[in-house]
Amino acid sequence: MLHEARDRQKFVSDVQYLRDMQHKVDSEYQACLKRQEHKKEPNEKKQEQLWGKDTSDRSRFSSGSSCKQSSGEEDSLSEARLATKAPTAKCEPKLPAIDQTSVKQKHKGTMTLKKPEKVSPSKPSAVAQATKILSRKRRPNLGRLTVSPEMHSPRLSGERSRQKAQLSTKTSGLLGADPVVQQDSLLSANEMKLKRPAREKRNLAPSSQLVRVAGKAPLERQKKGDPSARPQNEPHTALSQTFQPMSGSQVLTESSVPPFLPATVVGPRRAPFRFHDEDFYSALSLNNEQENYDTEEETRTEEELLLAGMRSPPSYKRSRFLGTSAAQNRNVEENAENLRGNSLRRSEPNPGSPRKTSVTEPTTKQSSPGQRMLQDTRLPRELAKDNPSGDQDEKTPVPGDAKSDGVTQVSAEDVSNNCAVEDRSAVHNCERDWQRYLSGSRNSFDCLLSGRPTAPRASVNPSYNAHGSLFHSAVIDDIPASLSVSSILVPSAELEENLRFNVRRPLSPIRNRNPSAASESHSEDTQGEEERASTSQAQESPLLSDLPNPQSSMALGDSPSSPTRRHLQGHFYMPGSLQENIPFTFFAVSDFASQNDNGTSVRVSGVMDEKATEIKADPEKLRKLQESLLEEDSEEEGDLCRICQIAGGSPANPLLEPCGCVGSLQFVHQECLKKWLKVKITSGADLSTVKTCEMCKQGLLVDLDDFNMTEFYHKHQQSRAQSELMNSGLYLVLLLHLYEQRFAELMTLNYRRASRERMSRNYPQPRPEESESSESGDGNESNVYPGRVI
C-alpha cells in the first residue's frame, strides 16, 4: 500500500511539473514574439521611409520644372485623397500622392501631377496607402514578362545603353526638330521610369503612374501651344537617347506608344484562362471598383511597355522605317489633330459600355503607314486584352460624317498593305536576323512583311491613316486575354476569319480554331504570302463593309466557302517570340496538334469501321468455336462416372446404372458404388437409407456378385453391438476398482477407531495433570491420523 501511494503521489507531482513547464515555455514564447514585433516595427518604418524618399526622388526627376498644378487641381486631389480609403492597410509607406480624378477628367486629359515638394514624408496620404496595397496585390511578375536578358540585369542594360547612345543620337538627328520626336522622347523617358523600379521588384505603381501623368501634361500643353512644355522635352530627349537600346519600344519612333494609351480601358473583361503563371493573369483579372482606376491603368501600361519590348525588331531595321519623309509625318499630324476633337466628342458616356477609354492621346502621335503596320502587328494582344466588349461604338472617329464606316475600312486596308519596305532581299536579311534575335524561331511573323507590296498607300486617304491602330481595338475587343497571340496576328482581309475562331467562342480556343502550321521552306512562305496579298487586296472592300457591326462580320466569317478561310489555313505563321511566353505557346502548339483534323478524321473513321466489322464477326467465330469444342469434348469424354469422374469402364469394373438418374449422374463404376455403400453403412445409416438414391430418391438396383449389401449391413450391426458390450464391461470393471479402493480406506478408519476405544477401556483414568498431558497427546495423535486418512 505504501509503495502504491508513493507512486501515485509521484505521478501527480510529475504531471503538475510538466504543466508548469509547459506554461513557462508558452509564456517565454509569447514574450519572444512580442520582442520580435517591437524590433520589426522600427525596421519597417525605416524601410518605408527609404522607399518613400526614393519614390519621391524619382517622381521629382521625372516631372522636372514644368510639373505645376493649379489650385482647382489641388482641391480635386484633396477630395480624391479623402474619398479613397484603404481599410486593409497595415503599413504606411511614405510615397508621393497620386492624382485620382474622375473618368471624365481622364478623358479630357486634365489628370496632372502634384508637386512632390508638397508631399511630406512624415505624413503619408491615404491615397498612397491604397495605391501601394493595390500595386502589391495586382502587380504582375515582371520577371516572367521579360524576354531579353537586359530586363534581368540592369548593369548589362546600362552598358548597352551607353554603347548605343550614338546610334540613337543619329536617329533623332535625322528627324530634326520634329515635334513628334520630342513626344517620342517623352514616352521613352516614361518607359525608363517604368523599368527602373523593376529592379527593385516592388513599389512600382505610384512612381510609374506619376511618370505617365507627367508625360501627358506637357504633351497637351505642347498641342495647345504652351511654350512651357518645350524646356522639359530637351532633358527627356537626352534620357531617351541613353535608354533607347534597352527599352525596345523605340523601334517605331513616335508611333510605338499610341496604342498603349487607348488600350488602357478600365471596363470589365472576361476572366482569362488560368495556368501556372497565376501572377501574370491575376494582374489581368477583372476589377470593377472605381477606386482602382489609377492602379489598373498604370499596371496595364507597364505590362504593355514590357510586352512591346519583347517583339521589337533590331536597330538597323529601325532606321529603314525612320527614313520616311517629314512631309508625310506633318500631314498625318494635321489629320490627327482634326480627328482628335471628334474623338473627344465621341468619348462621352454611353449606356452601351460600362466604362469609357481616353481617345485623346493616341490620335496625336501617328506616323507613316509602314510604322503603323509594324505597330499593329506587334501589339495586337495588348489592344485585345484591354478593350472589353461593348466599346466598339466609341472607336468610330467622325460621328457626324457619312463616311464613318469607310474610315474603319480604309484603316484596315492600311494595316494590311501600308508596309514601307524598300527591297525584299534586305527584308529577308532583317527577318533572318530578327528570327535569330528572337531565340531562333524559324517561322516568325516577319514572313508576313516579305510578301506585302512595297508601294505605300498613305496618299489614298491620309486622314484615315491616323486611326489604323484603332481598327484592331475596335474589332477584336471581345477576344479574351488568354488566347494565343498567333490567333490575332493576321492581316486585314483575314481578320473576319480570325474573329470566327476567337470572338464568338472565347472559352474553347483550341477546339474551334484550325490553322495549319507553316512547315514550308522560307522561299515557299514568301511566295504564298505574295499570292495571299494579291487575293486579300481584291477582296478587301466586300469583306470589310460590315466591320463596324461585329455580328455581321462574324456571320460572314462563318461561311465555309470563304476564300479567305482557305488562305488563312494555307498561310498562317506563329511569331517567334511565342517561345518565350509559355502560357501563350500552349495555345499556339495546340494549333499544330489540330492542323490535320480533316485527314485524321477520315483515317480514323476508316479504321473504326474496320474495327466495327471485326467486332461484329468475333461473336460468330466464338460461338462456332464453342460448339466445336463441346462436340469434341462429348466425343472424347463419353460416359462419366458420377463419383470418380472418369470416362469409360472395364470388364472388371464396368459402368452401372443403379438408379433413374440421367445425364452426368446416370453412370457409376461398380467399385465406386461398393465403396459408397460401405461408407454409408459404416457411418450409421439404416438399411432403407442405404438402398435409396440421394438424387432421384429411387431404390438402388444393386446386384453384385461379390457384394451383398444386406449381409454386410447385418455383420456391421453385430460388430457394432459387440463393441458396445465390450465398452460397457470395461466401464463396470473400472467402477469396481474404484469401489474397492474406497472400501479399503473406510475399513482402515474403522479399525483405528476400534483399537483406540479398546485401549481406553483397558487402562484406568489418569490424574488431572496426566489427563491433560494425555489429552494433548491424543490431540496430537488425532491431528496426525486424520491427516493420514485424508
Swiss-Prot record:
The RING-CH-type zinc finger domain is required for E3 ligase activity. A zinc finger (RING-CH-type) spans 633-703. It comes from the Eukaryota. Residues 61-70, 774-783 have a biased composition (Low complexity). Keywords: Coiled coil, Metal-binding, Phosphoprotein, Transferase, Ubl conjugation pathway, Zinc, Zinc-finger. Residues 34-48, 218-227, 521-533 have a biased composition (Basic and acidic residues). GO terms for molecular function: transferase activity; zinc ion binding. Its EC number is 2.3.2.27. GO terms for biological process: protein ubiquitination. PANTHER family: E3 UBIQUITIN-PROTEIN LIGASE MARCHF10-RELATED, MARCH7/10 E3 UBIQUITIN PROTEIN LIGASE FAMILY MEMBER. Residues 33-240, 323-416, 507-569, 757-790 are annotated as: Disordered. InterPro entries: RING-CH-type_E3_ubiq-ligase (IPR052297), Znf_RING-CH (IPR011016), Znf_RING/FYVE/PHD (IPR013083). It is an enzyme of class 2 (transferase). Pathway: Protein modification; protein ubiquitination. Zn(2+) 1 binds at residues 641, 644, 669, 672. Residues 284-308 form a coiled coil. The modification Phosphoserine is found at residue 78. This is Probable E3 ubiquitin-protein ligase MARCHF10. Zn(2+) 2 binds at residues 659, 661, 693, 696. The keyword Coiled coil applies. E3 ubiquitin-protein ligase. E3 ubiquitin ligases accept ubiquitin from an E2 ubiquitin-conjugating enzyme in the form of a thioester and then directly transfer the ubiquitin to targeted substrates.
